[in-house]
């Protein structure tokens, strides 16, 4: 289902206008080149001949395109309303019906030929669109897989990076233990005068407790 298109009542006007603009631009370019080529010799006459050809023949071409677009969109809306779905078959049947309707004044044989041509052209367009969509979908899947592989490779660090990170972590832990040791020693130095004043009169051996050495603190921190 095509979600980027307008609903059916508005779709007819939209397709008619788009076809009219296509006929106007394409017809103007083609008729200008044709008029410039068929004009008499001289640049001014060539320019005037091209403009005159555009003025005379482009409106008819644009009108034919607009009628084709409106007829195609109308048949497409009828098919959507009847089948209650939007797929490639609607466009193919609409192309055949449009070709037959527009060639109705030329007889049954002309209608059949025009319907066959319209059906063939729309089938080729729908097939090309489906092929392009499939190619883009496959490319998107491959790119998604490549991006996932790249992310996985980025998440897996090399062995030397892991060893460097572990050594950095060990060094940081050792530095933290040394800082705690320095802070503990400074705290003991600050508490020593206060203890001596509080326990004045007692024996010096009972007052002063042995201080922990750096090796003992490292063992208490479970580094070794």
Curated annotation (Swiss-Prot):
Keyword Membrane belongs to the record: yes
Membrane-spanning ranges: 16-36, 60-80, 115-135
Pfam families: Tim17
GO cellular component, one term: TIM23 mitochondrial import inner membrane translocase complex
Top-level taxon of origin: Eukaryota
Location(s) in or outside the cell: Mitochondrion inner membrane
GO biological process, one term: protein import into mitochondrial matrix
Alphabetically ordered keywords of this record: Membrane, Mitochondrion, Mitochondrion inner membrane, Protein transport, Translocation, Transmembrane, Transmembrane helix, Transport
Membrane topology according to the record: Multi-pass membrane protein
Subunit structure: Component of the TIM23 complex at least composed of Tim23, Tim17 (Tim17a1, Tim17a2 or Tim17b1) and a Tim50. The complex interacts with the Tim44 component of the PAM complex.
Cited function: Essential component of the TIM23 complex, a complex that mediates the translocation of transit peptide-containing proteins across the mitochondrial inner membrane.
Family recorded in the similarity comment: Belongs to the Tim17/Tim22/Tim23 family.
Protein name: Probable mitochondrial import inner membrane translocase subunit Tim17 4
Organism: Drosophila melanogaster
């Amino acid at each position: 289902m095509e979600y980027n298109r307008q609903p059916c009542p508005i779709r007819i006007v939209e397709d008619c206008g788009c076809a009219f603009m296509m006929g106007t631009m394409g017809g103007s370019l083609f008729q200008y080149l044709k008029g410039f080529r068929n004009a008499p010799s001289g640049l001014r006459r060539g320019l005037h001949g091209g403009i005159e050809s555009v003025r005379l023949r482009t409106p008819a071409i644009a009108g034919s395109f607009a009628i084709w677009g409106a007829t195609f969109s109308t048949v497409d809306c009828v098919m959507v309303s009847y089948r209650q779905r939007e797929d490639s078959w609607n466009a193919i049947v609409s192309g055949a019906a449009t070709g037959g309707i527009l060639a109705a004044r030329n007889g049954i044989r002309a209608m059949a030929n025009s319907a066959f041509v319209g059906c063939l052209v729309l089938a080729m367009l729908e097939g090309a669109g489906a092929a392009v969509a499939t190619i883009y979908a496959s490319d998107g899947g491959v790119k998604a897989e490549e991006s996932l592989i790249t992310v996985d490779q980025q998440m897996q660090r090399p062995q030397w990076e892991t060893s460097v990170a572990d050594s950095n972590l060990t060094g940081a832990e050792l530095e933290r233990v040394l800082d705690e040791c320095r802070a503990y020693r400074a705290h003991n130095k600050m508490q020593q005068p206060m203890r001596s004043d509080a326990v004045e009169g007692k024996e010096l051996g009972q007052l002063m407790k042995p201080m922990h050495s750096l090796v003992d603190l490292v063992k208490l921190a479970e580094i070794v």
